[in-house]
């Protein structure tokens, strides 16, 4: 009888332990292990559609003085007309938490001249992670496999590294790429590439 009671007690403990266990589903987009942020080669930068002659000299940039102790937010929403007559829409939402850096800094965001990427200045490392929401609409994605499109850090040496985020969306017919809550640890150049292969099977990337 004592043996039966002991077995019953152990069984109940195991069942309670299983009920209290955390959800073990993997979300690579939102919580990529640090080891996965390795440099990748053989990538291809996704180009911006060529501007029409009337828009050729247009530059898309924004600057704002931010108190690092307070934090702040910068939103840039612009568009231009491509040479084929279609609109290219550009959106950036940069969120800077309080305590990200010390003192006042003039933060500047500049759209790259050729590729789907943004330059962020001044170059510095943060005490707290910045959050970036960024999208393009009206890109020519017909020749790309959507499963290999990703948002990355573009290093000065030509290499790229994956960026932790809460999800990447690719809508091929409308030429849309969108990243949610990309975690920026430092300022540099960030943008969109086609990788040579799918390095991690992000389960929450939605392709249409």
Q: What kind of region is each of these model predictions?
A:
Residues 133-137:
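Short edge beta-strand/loop segments characteristic of extracellular beta-sandwich folds
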Residues 14-17:
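C-terminal motif of bacterial Sec signal peptides marking the signal peptidase cleavage site
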Residues 2-9:
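Sec-dependent signal peptide recognition
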Residues 19-89, 123-127, 140-208:
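Proteolytic cleavage junctions
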Residues 96:
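B-type heme-binding environments
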Residues 105-113:
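Low-complexity, Ser/Thr/Pro-rich intrinsically disordered linker/stalk segments at domain junctions
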Residues 112-120:
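Short beta-strand elements of extracellular/lumenal beta-sandwich folds
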């Amino acid at each position: 009888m004592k043996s039966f009671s002991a077995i019953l007690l152990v069984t109940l403990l195991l069942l309670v332990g299983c009920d209290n266990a955390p959800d073990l589903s993997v979300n690579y987009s939102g919580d990529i292990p640090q080891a996965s942020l390795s440099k990748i080669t053989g990538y291809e930068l996704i180009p911006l559609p060529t501007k029409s002659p009337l828009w050729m000299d247009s530059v898309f940039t924004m600057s704002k003085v931010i108190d690092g102790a307070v934090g702040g937010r910068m939103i840039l929403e612009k568009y231009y007309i491509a040479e084929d007559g279609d609109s290219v829409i550009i959106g950036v939402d940069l969120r800077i938490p309080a305590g990200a850096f010390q003192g006042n800094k003039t933060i500047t965001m500049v759209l790259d001249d050729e590729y789907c990427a943004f330059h962020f200045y001044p170059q510095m490392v943060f005490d707290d992670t910045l959050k970036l929401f960024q999208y393009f609409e009206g890109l020519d994605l017909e020749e790309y496999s959507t499963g290999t499109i990703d948002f990355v850090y573009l290093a000065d040496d030509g290499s790229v590294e994956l960026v932790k985020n809460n999800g990447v969306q690719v809508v091929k017919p409308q030429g849309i790429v969108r990243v949610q809550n990309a975690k920026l640890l430092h300022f540099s150049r960030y943008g969109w590439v086609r990788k040579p292969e799918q390095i991690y099977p992000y389960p929450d990337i939605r392709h249409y």
